[in-house]
């Protein structure tokens, strides 16, 4: 993992705080000297549509191209959790396994550096 920078996050439930946190993350990511992976619980109650502008500005894409929900784990309906990746990274597999050890389902992703 020497050739990549990984950010793990758990963003605020409050929209305004979350937007401040995303702005700070954008500043960190825009200065990153290596390819970036950003993953965690984003608490985005509108799913990827809430993340759209941040992702475009930061040059990130979601590994979850099907928009599979991860919350709540027993009957997942919302996409609160993301694995985002930038240029120089290729996703080779992605899944959301049905593991009920948390209120969120896990995200599993394999990637390769290009």
Language model segments and positions:
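Active-site regions of metal-assisted phosphoester/phosphodiester hydrolases
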Residues: 1-114
